[in-house]
Amino acid sequence: MSRRSTAKKRLILPDPIYNSRLVTLLINHMLKDGKKSIARSFIYEALKIIEEKKGSDPLEVLEQAVRNSTPLIEVKARRIGGSTYQVPMEVRVDRGITLALRVVNSFSLQRLGKTIAVKLANELIDAANETGNTIKKREEMHRMAEANKAFVHYRY
């Protein structure tokens, strides 16, 4: 890792069908072995399932799910004087979206169901309704930060 300069953020282009950067981020998080066309197909299928179930715009459901599952604060390990402290840190917007999509992805893969599209659609609907495992994970992160708020002065 170079110390000379920070890496530039790459521009994320919106996907061709929904014209949304969030859908592109979700596709990139669902990639397996670099097979983007497969990831794209089951995400589009999941968005169609959401549209059938909810009867509303699937992009709004996706945005609401990401908004509900984005943590505001997280803990990071910081080693000070031989002991490691869990230091609460505020989450930047782009990191929050990344964390939310990562959690939605992992819990949708663990769900019971026939296809990955159905699992993902159900997880996104649950997250949009503020239920399910993704919301529990966010609340757990907030509880960890609350429990360790005594170490907030170790922030860097």
Curated annotation (Swiss-Prot):
GO MF terms, alphabetically ordered: rRNA binding; structural constituent of ribosome
Keyword Ligase on entry: no
GO terms of biological process kind: translation
Function, in words: One of the primary rRNA binding proteins, it binds directly to 16S rRNA where it nucleates assembly of the head domain of the 30S subunit.
Protein name: Small ribosomal subunit protein uS7c
Family statement drawn from the similarity comment of this UniProt entry: Belongs to the universal ribosomal protein uS7 family.
Compartments in which it is found: Plastid, Cyanelle
Subunit structure: Part of the 30S ribosomal subunit.
Entry keyword set: Cyanelle, Plastid, Ribonucleoprotein, Ribosomal protein, RNA-binding, rRNA-binding
Pfam family, one: Ribosomal_S7
PANTHER family (alphabetical): RIBOSOMAL PROTEIN S7
Keyword field contains Plastid: yes
